[in-house]
């Protein structure tokens, strides 16, 4: 019945009541405390076994550390062995090198000793050979002297042996340098292919580069510095030459009579500033050389030497005087300063030459003058005058030119006739030059020729006076 009731009347379902939050928290804490107590109990029960495990773990760690240390020690030992082996190898190599260097030094010392001994032996042999040669030479000289004494005792003539046939053949075959013979200087110097005959005695003294100025020193820079020529002028250079002339010429005149004094104004190095002094005799020139050589002037030491120049017409550039030299500053003939008052003008015309040279050149000059035209003859007559002052000659020439220009229209016929008479008659200067040249000959020939020349001179003077009278008479008409 009860089962039937249960089946027919089911039991009413009940749902649990949800606890509150506070209860829930309390139950949770309780559960946690329970679990903690259980854990502590379990740990308390297993406490002894845990200590044993810890001991075994510690022992295992110690064993592991010991193994690691042992392996590290073995590794370090192996590394030390490698380093030691390497060091031993390096030490062995170093030792071998030191031994090799020591052996090489010993070998070098041995070779040097052998070379020194060989050199000493050669020097001894050379010294012995020299002594032997010297002894042989002395014996030969002594033998020659003994032979010479014997020859003298036997009254036989003795002389020095003849030189070899080919001795100085090249020097003899070489031609003389024309520039050195004419100017006493050559631009090639010792490198010249021609022969320079240096005189042992001469009346002309040469002092190289004695006269120097700023313009002459700066001449080399003209090609590279065209403005350098603005710092000096020819007037300043000539004024410096005049001061130099007045300063040094009295010193040269104190030694002897100076018949020529020239200063070169060339710009070439071998002629620049050269001073030429010609004395009347070679003895005076030698005295001047011994006096002035090595002296100091303007901060420079003088270098004096004998000069072969005696004919100044050949040495001085004639085109330079008329400012028509085509070579300019590269000319190898003398470009000289003009002496004040035209001093030593006689030497410029080679009047001071010896009688032999003048006599030998007189025939050639006379033949040449006979072939000269009126124009050349007129200027040669002007050069042959005795007037020592060139200014006076220039003045007279200027006056004659003015007179000729004033009478050019009306007096042309008379001038041509007078010029022909002058051309046919001997000139005054030529007669004087001829009488001076031939005055050193014998007295009879000199007196005879002086009479003939005086008569011709009187005739030429009479003709010139008559020509001057005609000019003075007709000059008022021309005016």
Swiss-Prot record:
Q: Where is the composition biased (Basic and acidic residues)?
A: 365-379, 388-403
Q: Which UniProt keywords apply?
A: Isopeptide bond, Metal-binding, Nucleus, Phosphoprotein, Repeat, Ribonucleoprotein, RNA-binding, Ubl conjugation, Zinc, Zinc-finger
Bias class Basic residues marks the residues at 20-37, 404-417, 442-451
Name the major location. Answer: nucleus
Cross-linked residues, Glycyl lysine isopeptide (Lys-Gly) (interchain with G-Cter in SUMO2): 67
Which InterPro entries does the entry link to? Nucleotide-bd_a/b_plait_sf, RBD_domain_sf, RRM_dom, RRM_dom_euk, U2AF_small, Znf_CCCH
Q: In which residue ranges is the amino acid composition biased (Acidic residues)?
A: 50-63
Assigned GO CC terms: spliceosomal complex; U2AF complex
Tell me which residues make up the RRM domain.
203-309
| Record's subcellular location | Nucleus
Question: Which stretches of the protein fold into C3H1-type zinc fingers, per the record?
Answer: 171-199, 311-338
Give the molecular function GO annotations: pre-mRNA 3'-splice site binding; zinc ion binding
Residues with the modification Phosphoserine, per the entry, are 354, 389
Biological processes per GO annotation: mRNA splicing, via spliceosome
Domain of life where this protein originates: Eukaryota
Tell me which Pfam families the record gives. RRM_1 (PF00076), zf-CCCH (PF00642)
Stretches for region Disordered: 1-63, 356-479
Its protein name is U2 small nuclear ribonucleoprotein auxiliary factor 35 kDa subunit-related protein 1
Q: Which organism is it from?
A: Homo sapiens (Human)
- Upper taxonomic classification of the species? Eukaryota, Metazoa, Chordata, Craniata, Vertebrata
């Amino acid at each position: 019945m009860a089962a039937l009731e249960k089946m027919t009347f089911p039991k009413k379902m009940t749902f649990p009541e949800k606890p509150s939050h506070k209860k829930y928290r309390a139950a949770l804490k309780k559960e946690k405390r329970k679990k903690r107590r259980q854990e502590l109990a379990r740990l308390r029960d297993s406490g002894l076994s845990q200590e044993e495990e810890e001991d075994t773990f510690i022992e295992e760690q110690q064993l592991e550390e010991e193994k690691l240390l042992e392996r590290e020690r073995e590794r370090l030992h192996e590394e030390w062995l490698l380093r030691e082996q390497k060091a031993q190898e390096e030490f062995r190599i170093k030792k071998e090198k030191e031994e090799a260097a020591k052996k090489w030094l010993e070998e070098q010392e041995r070779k040097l000793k052998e070379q020194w001994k060989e050199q000493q032996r050669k020097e001894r042999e050379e010294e012995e050979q020299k002594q032997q040669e010297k002894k042989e030479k002395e014996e030969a000289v002594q033998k020659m002297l003994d032979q010479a004494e014997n020859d003298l005792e036997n009254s036989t003539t003795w002389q020095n042996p003849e030189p070899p046939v080919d001795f100085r053949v090249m020097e003899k075959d070489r031609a003389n340098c024309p520039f050195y013979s004419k100017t006493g200087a050559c631009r090639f110097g010792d490198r010249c292919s021609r022969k320079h005959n240096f005189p042992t005695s001469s009346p002309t003294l040469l002092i190289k580069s004695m006269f120097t100025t700023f313009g002459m020193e700066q001449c080399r820079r003209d090609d590279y510095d065209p403005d350098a020529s603005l710092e000096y002028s020819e007037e300043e250079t000539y004024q410096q030459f005049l001061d130099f002339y007045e300063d040094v010429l009295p010193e040269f005149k104190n030694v002897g009579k100076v018949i020529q004094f020239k200063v070169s104004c060339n710009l070439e190095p071998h002629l620049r500033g050269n001073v030429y002094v010609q004395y009347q005799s070679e003895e005076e020139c030698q005295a001047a050389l011994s006096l002035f050589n090595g002296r100091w002037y303007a901060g420079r030491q003088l270098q004096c030497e004998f000069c072969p120049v005696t004919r100044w017409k050949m040495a001085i550039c004639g085109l330079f005087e008329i400012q028509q030299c085509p070579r300019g500053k590269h000319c190898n003939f003398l470009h000289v300063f003009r002496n004040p008052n035209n001093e030593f003008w006689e030497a410029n015309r080679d009047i001071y030459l010896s009688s032999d040279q003048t006599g030998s050149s007189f025939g050639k000059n006379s033949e040449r003058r006979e072939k000269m035209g009126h124009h050349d003859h007129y200027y040669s007559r002007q050069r042959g005058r005795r007037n020592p002052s060139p200014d006076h000659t220039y003045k007279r020439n200027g006056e004659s030119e003015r007179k000729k220009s004033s009478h050019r229209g009306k007096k042309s016929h008379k001038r041509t006739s007078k010029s022909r008479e002058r051309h046919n008659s001997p000139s005054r200067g030529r007669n004087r030059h001829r009488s001076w040249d031939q005055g050193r000959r014998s007295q009879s020939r000199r007196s005879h020729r002086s009479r003939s020349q005086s008569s011709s001179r009187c005739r030429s003077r009479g003709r010139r006076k008559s020509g001057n009278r005609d000019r003075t008479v007709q000059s008022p008409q021309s005016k």
